[in-house]
Amino acid sequence: MKDFNDIETIDFAETGCSFTREAIASGGYYQALKTPTCKEISGRRYKGTNTPDAVRDLWSTPREVIAYLEGRYGKYDLDAAASEENKVCEKFYSQETNCLKRWWGKNKHVWLNPPYSRPDIFVKKAIEQMEHNNQIDMLLPADNSTAWFTEARQNAAEIIWIEADLTEDIDGNEYARSGRLAFISGETGKAVDGNNKGSVIFIMRELKEGEVQQTHYIPITSICPSVKNKRAKVRKVD
């Protein structure tokens, strides 16, 4: 304890905290490091996202989704928003070649998994390009509270909702596997669970005469069979 008759000694308990605050406030040496630009997380895409901005739009589609859709509708002629590393067919448009400024052709089967930070403009482009007798299979978050979702739904020939997988054992116990896709990280190249939304696929093409829009509800295990290898969780509803 400091002797109050001692006017020479400095008591750090009294002055240290204010010294530290002043040093930091003045921009001194001991400053908190800024987050590297490549790691910044703004949350502009969805509230609660933990994905750095630099790779937020670089997620790749699980290849089982592509295999399912090609088995159902035929091979793809064009990947409208891809890179050399994650393209699903030989012809693709990258960020540099920009599908938004191009004609996608005629009578083509097109895959589109657009950047989720700005889906509106890609939905409008798909609607424009399907008028050339193209079919555009567009994967989007299952967020029907948005204007772009409504616009896609209004113009789609088919809508595929990817659902959870539910099973029941002989004793009546229910088990579930999440219907949320595990996208491939642009940062690590590995599939990542914990997607914060479900997914929906809009089949964008003009309806034939007499045809009406169809809506399908497909369990994730029918689209991505490897999900069956994941342990199902007991479903408790009480």
From Swiss-Prot:
E.C. designation(s): 2.1.1.72
Primary enzyme class: transferase
Keyword Methyltransferase: yes
GO BP field: DNA restriction-modification system; methylation; symbiont-mediated evasion of host restriction-modification system; symbiont-mediated suppression of host innate immune response
Induction: Expressed early in the viral replication cycle.
Temperature optimum or stability note: Optimum temperature is between 40 and 43 degrees Celsius.
This protein's UniProt keywords: Host-virus interaction, Inhibition of host innate immune response by virus, Methyltransferase, Restriction-modification system evasion by virus, S-adenosyl-L-methionine, Transferase, Viral immunoevasion
Function: Methyltransferase that methylates adenine residues in the dsDNA sequence 5'-GATC-3'. May prevent degradation of viral DNA by the host restriction-modification antiviral defense system.
Protein name: DNA N-6-adenine-methyltransferase
Organism of this sequence: Escherichia phage T1 (Bacteriophage T1)
